[in-house]
Amino acid sequence: MGGQTVWMTLSFKLLLYYCMISLLMPAIFILATRAQVDKFRKFNESTQTKSSQELFEEAFEEQGYYLQRLFLQYGDNGTLTYEGLQKLLGSLGLGEVSVLEIRHGEAKHPSQSISHSHSHEDHHPSQGTTNSPPLRESLDAKSALSGSPAELGRSDYFLHPALRNKQEESVSLLSDHPTEKHLHGNCLNVTQLLWNFGLGQASHITPAHFTFLCPALLYQIESGVCLRHTEDHSQASKTSEGFLIALGWASLALLVISLPSLVALGMAPLLQPSVLQVFLCPMAGMAVGTLCGDALLHLMPHAIFSQHTDHQNAVFKGLSVLGGLYLLFIFESLLGLKQHFKNLKRRKHDAECGRELDALQGTSSANQNESSGHGHSHGQAEPGQTGIRSMAWMVVMGDGIHNLTDGLAIGVAFSQSLTGGFSTAIAVFCHELPHELGDLAVLLSAGWPVRRLLVFSGLSALLGFVGVLAGSALGNHWASHSPWILTLTAGVFLYVALADMMPEMLHGACGSVSPLKRFLLQALGLLTGGAIMLCIALFEDHIAVSLGENSLGEN
């Protein structure tokens, strides 16, 4: 019983303590919060008081430091001479017009072609010419560090106290100087710059004087009036020189790239048909993989993500890819229509000849049936032969257009830079061998002899050199059109791969290769071709041959 009483007493005391703590905690929290608020308020007030007194002092000290560094380097005894200021302007690229050589693909410095005199009234129409200039008003005004915020905008407020003893000298030089008409759009030399600020009488430029010149120097640097691009007077001669250099390198690269065609033609007679079929299955897949990979991983990213490409421009470049697809579709469709009408005309002519022959010979009904059967058999066999022939011609023309676009891409790349041209040539070379072997598979299945393949390979290579000539000319004379050529090339590559090569992979004759083995070989070739193009796209900068030159403009 006694234990229960003690337990109840302890429980009552604990409950009482808990209630007291629950009541006191909000009050303690409020007092602590108020103390923190008061402390923060006092700190903020002290910071504001410190800022109003010391903020600009620190700015003055920083300004004085940089002025001291400049005057130590270009001045003498704390002042700048005429020669010292001229040396400073020369190190900044000011004081005289200098020629700036612009490389292809680089952004040009924004320059203005303004070279006329204008009045200060153009910028301040509300101020008459008889009034004192605002600069002099700010120089005559007196202010203290504790001045009002309205006084902070005056020029003398931002002068370091150590420099204010030079202010009277500045005012005396600026007071009688007319500021109505100055050449602000020209590249000012030292004499013109000093005359604009009324400092022509000053034998030495003090730090106070120099603070007046700084905005003019910054404007001259930002506007680029002292820069003149080489395109203004000497780009024509360098364009012709760059065209010849690009044409030479691109032709040499295309000559090396054309070697896989000869290799493929040399390998064909040495291999048995069954072995050649097994070898060509992965090669056809590799041709599709390299063509699609080159278009999607190399050409389109280079064109769409070029410099100064906005969203609308990127959309139109994507439309250019679609234009390449449509262009080759129209070309091959016209080729097929021509072959179709030619076959119709041939059938009609054969039928008329057969009827005339039957009428002249007066053959028996049995002979007529035999002749009719022959005509029917020819009609049945001709569509298949026509389909194979049309496919072969489409592959030949597609290969010619492919080489033409290859030449365009290589010519444009070499016209922009040698390293970029070699990088594009490496990419084209990597997919040229499987592409040529894939074309060879289609043409051999159509029954083309090796001699005919050799002739058309030579004609296709000539189209490549035509593309090199056109690409070099476009890249040098119309460099802004280079991305559009790349996107058009990408569209042609996609069409050749997906419309010509892919159907042959899916529906072509298997020969002695089983369907499963054929599928595995084609899938392996497709992945290999895509992997090759991916590696080139990712490590293009590493595999590009460095010649110590970034552009043809340096040659």
Curated annotation (Swiss-Prot):
Q: Where is the composition biased (Polar residues)?
A: 363-374
The record gives the membrane topology as: Multi-pass membrane protein
Show the catalytic activity: Zn(2+)(in) = Zn(2+)(out)
What ranges does the Extracellular topological domain annotation cover?
1-242, 336-408, 474-482, 540-555
Q: Where is this region: Disordered?
A: 108-148, 363-383
One Pfam family, short name: Zip
Asked if the keyword Ion transport belongs to this entry, the reply reads yes
Cytoplasmic face residues: 264-314, 430-452, 504-518
| Annotated keywords | Cell membrane, Ion transport, Membrane, Transmembrane, Transmembrane helix, Transport, Zinc, Zinc transport
Cellular component terms, GO, for this chain's entry? basolateral plasma membrane; plasma membrane
Superkingdom of source: Eukaryota
Q: Where is this gene product found? A: Basolateral cell membrane
Ribonucleoprotein: present as a keyword of the record? no
Description of the deletion phenotype: Homozygous knockout fishes laking develop normally until 48 hpf, when they develop cardiac ischaemia.
Q: Where are the transmembrane segments?
A: 243-263, 315-335, 409-429, 453-473, 483-503, 519-539
| Main location (coarse class) | membrane
UniProt cross-references to InterPro entries, sorted A to Z:
ZIP, ZIP_Transporter
A Gene Ontology biological process noted in the UniProt record is:
intracellular monoatomic cation homeostasis
> Can you name one GO molecular function term for this protein?
zinc ion transmembrane transporter activity
Signal sequence: where? none
PANTHER family, per this entry?
Answer: SOLUTE CARRIER FAMILY 39, ZINC TRANSPORTER ZIP5
Q: What does this protein do?
A: Uniporter that transports zinc(2+) into polarized cells of enterocytes, pancreatic acinar and endoderm cells across the basolateral membrane and participates, notably, in zinc excretion from the intestine by the uptake of zinc from the blood into the intestine. The transport mechanism is temperature- and concentration-dependent and saturable. Mediates zinc homeostasis that is essential for venous angiogenesis.
UniProt family annotation: Belongs to the ZIP transporter (TC 2.A.5) family.
Q: Which protein, by its recorded name, is this?
A: Zinc transporter ZIP5
Organism, scientific name = Danio rerio (Zebrafish)
